[in-house]
Regions:
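Glycine-rich phosphate-binding loop of ATP-dependent small-molecule kinases
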Residues: 1-256
Length: 256
């Protein structure tokens, strides 16, 4: 599949196409490893990874999406966001880094409009959410704590992820409801098995694009590990219905 990805990149450059890939998910979902595998053999001159730091004091005064616009792909480019504007749909509201109004009244209302503008700008747009279970996340955190070479990956925010699991689940549900649209849909990839998740990512992308001398059938996606945003919403709602809506914040089930 790496050869096929390189063929696709060559076609992107030759035709002046623009490709944008968002990789989202909880902490320890395997986002970084998947991106590393995705770009492993791509030409770095035509491929960029965007992983922005927390906003500066100046950026905090700007339109929320402004800092991301400068990083969108130009003709011939593939751009991969390692987390994106969806920080405001997950970690920011859960950790109190933004107000409820900034989250619900602005972001969740505006993000479909913003992404429609991206889609209407002839950008090939993918949105992936890597879904890790609570138990697997806990195991990953324990490995990071015990491995000096991985301890840098464990932040104070990460360490609260288990405690705030249910709130992150509700935030994910709100995000999918607001931003899973026909023009910019989500694809959910189960990532407890990191190797399979990476392979499914590559396979899914290749199944959705065409380029000269394409070889191989990539249409057989593992439906046990990959689903649409719409399917994920249905799964989450089936679990949510088991709980009194007034107590959902406290008693929601492990939905990932």
């Amino acid at each position: 599949m790496q050869i096929e990805l390189l063929k696709f990149q060559n076609d992107v450059k030759a035709k002046g196409l623009k490709v944008l890939i968002l990789i989202e998910g909880r902490d320890a979902a395997g986002k970084g490893g998947a991106i590393k595998r995705l770009i492993e053999h791509l030409n770095p001159r035509g491929c960029r990874i965007v992983a922005l730091e927390k906003p500066s004091d100046v950026e905090k005064t700007q339109w929320y999406f402004q800092c991301y616009i400068a990083h969108l792909p130009s003709a011939g480019e593939i751009v991969i966001f390692d987390r994106s504007w969806y920080n405001r749909a997950g970690v920011e509201p859960v950790m109190g880094f933004c107000t409820p109004q900034q989250h619900k009244d602005f972001f969740l209302r505006e993000v479909p409009l913003f992404e429609n503008m991206i889609s209407n700008s002839d950008i090939i747009f993918f949105k992936f959410y890597f879904s890790v279970s609570k138990d697997e996340q806990k195991k990953c955190f324990e490995k990071r704590r015990s491995d000096p070479l991985k301890q840098y990956k464990l932040s104070s925010v990460d360490q609260k992820s288990q405690e705030l699991w249910d709130k992150y689940t509700l935030a994910k549900y709100s995000m999918l409801l607001a931003s899973n649209t026909p023009t910019c849909p989500w694809t959910i990839i189960s990532s407890d098995d990191k190797k399979k998740a990476r392979l499914n990512l590559l396979r899914f992308i290749l199944s959705k694009v065409e380029y000269p001398k394409k070889t191989g059938d990539f249409s057989k996606i593992d439906v046990k590990l990959v689903c649409s945003g719409e399917e994920e919403i249905r799964k989450m709602e089936a679990n949510l219905e088991k709980f009194d809506s007034k107590k959902a914040d406290e008693k929601i089930k492990d939905l990932d």
